[in-house]
Amino acid sequence: MPFIPHTEEDIQAMLASIGANSIDELFDEIPPALKTGSLKRVPPGLSEMEISRLMLERAEQDGRYLNFIGAGAYEHHIPAAVWQIATRGEFYSSYTPYQAEASQGTLQLLYEYQTMMASLTGMDVSNASMYDGASALAEAALMAVRSHRTSRRILIPQTVHPVYRSVVRAIVKNQGIEVVEVPYDKLSGQTSLDGLKNFGSEEFAALVIPQPNFFGVLEDVDTLTDWAQSRDAFAIAVVNPMALAMLTPPGEWGEKGADIAVGEGQPLGIPLSSGGPYFGFMACKQPLVRQMPGRIIGRTTDQEGSDGFVLTLQAREQHIRRSKATSNICTNQGLMVTAATIYLALLGPEGLRRTAAQSHANTAALLEKLEKLKGVKRVFSGPVFHEAVISLPRPSASVLQALEARRILGGLNLKEYYPELGDAVLVCATETKTSGDMENYVTQLGEVIRNS
């Protein structure tokens, strides 16, 4: 189909073929009162050059902000080569057709991605991505219930991202699945082991285990994993992939390892970009692979013995099983996965470890400086990765607003999600922050607190 505007002759020919005299006549059935006529607030058209200039002017109004917000989406340095490669025509505009084997390059890249994510999580198999971390967790909950067969209850700690918990409830509630929340320890910020004991001998399909949790605190993942599996429940890990460069992978948690690992892939080379698009990842142990949603790429050989890549285990998918499929997800976030694969390949294991280690070191240094401010305290005693919760001596909303006026995004106000914490803020410092950035933040925060 050529993308060429209709000429006046084309329009008259089409009107004549349907017996209409004008375009307006096609809309005669709409009452005049419902017709707006011209849109008064729509400005006249601009040339390409004028639009470019206008967009630059609008962008300059935003300015540059120093960002200390994390909470599930993190500002990491992305090598220029990542998106230079990802936006090549072979990747950027390609699509895996229903005869997927015709796209060997795309399939090979997705296969490499799966290999990297399986290695990073310590699991047996990975799929080719999910929409985002929250929906990946919801799919993991559905997967656990299908595999468990006797229980339709999921335990989710309150230390899991509140938006993730909301998404899980929204997706599973119409399938007769109950979501039960586990309280957190008010001192450590970790999932309360005493809270788990209160469930007695009740049966659950799975326990969700965040690492690190929403507060930035590292959980006792070995104990939680063993607790779940000792009760014949699945252990679902929700992990930050950047943290896995330093921490024990889910596949090695406890005595047997977690059963399913999911998370948000944004830290792996995806820009913040106003909230998306991102991608979710999912990996699992081999016995659960037939319950895993999403595309899975396999490696095989053709009739001549050459290596090739295929979509495998397709009987799980909606284009084969329709309503009986594990999920209606299909190609989804392929371009984001392409960028993540390039990012992981460029950094390699050592580069990923350096990035994670610098993020951890920056957050530790920032917390040390913040705690020297009068009235600023760490809320939880548990160890952290690269973000933590601090309490402020002034209303958190007004403090953050004052910092924003100074072009500093000072953290996430937790009052909406955890009102019991009072004026608490979740702060994050990745490897992108210099000592000068952190010193500036602490200085400005101190001035705001003193002047409030």
Curated annotation (Swiss-Prot):
Family of the protein in this entry: Belongs to the GcvP family. N-terminal subunit subfamily.
Pfam family for this entry, one: GDC-P
Catalytically driven reaction(s): N(6)-[(R)-lipoyl]-L-lysyl-[glycine-cleavage complex H protein] + glycine + H(+) = N(6)-[(R)-S(8)-aminomethyldihydrolipoyl]-L-lysyl-[glycine-cleavage complex H protein] + CO2
Quaternary structure and interacting proteins, as annotated: The glycine cleavage system is composed of four proteins: P, T, L and H. In this organism, the P 'protein' is a heterodimer of two subunits.
Source taxonomy: Bacteria, Pseudomonadati, Pseudomonadota, Betaproteobacteria, Nitrosomonadales
HAMAP family named in the record: GcvPA
InterPro entries linked: GcvPA, GDC-P_N, GDC_P, PyrdxlP-dep_Trfase, PyrdxlP-dep_Trfase_major, PyrdxlP-dep_Trfase_small
Job of this protein: The glycine cleavage system catalyzes the degradation of glycine. The P protein binds the alpha-amino group of glycine through its pyridoxal phosphate cofactor; CO(2) is released and the remaining methylamine moiety is then transferred to the lipoamide cofactor of the H protein.
UniProt protein name: Probable glycine dehydrogenase (decarboxylating) subunit 1
EC number: 1.4.4.2
Record GO biological process: glycine decarboxylation via glycine cleavage system; nucleoside metabolic process
Gene3D superfamilies: Aspartate Aminotransferase, domain 1, Type I PLP-dependent aspartate aminotransferase-like (Major domain)
Keyword terms, alphabetized: Oxidoreductase
Molecular-function annotations in GO: glycine dehydrogenase (decarboxylating) activity
Top EC class of this enzyme: oxidoreductase
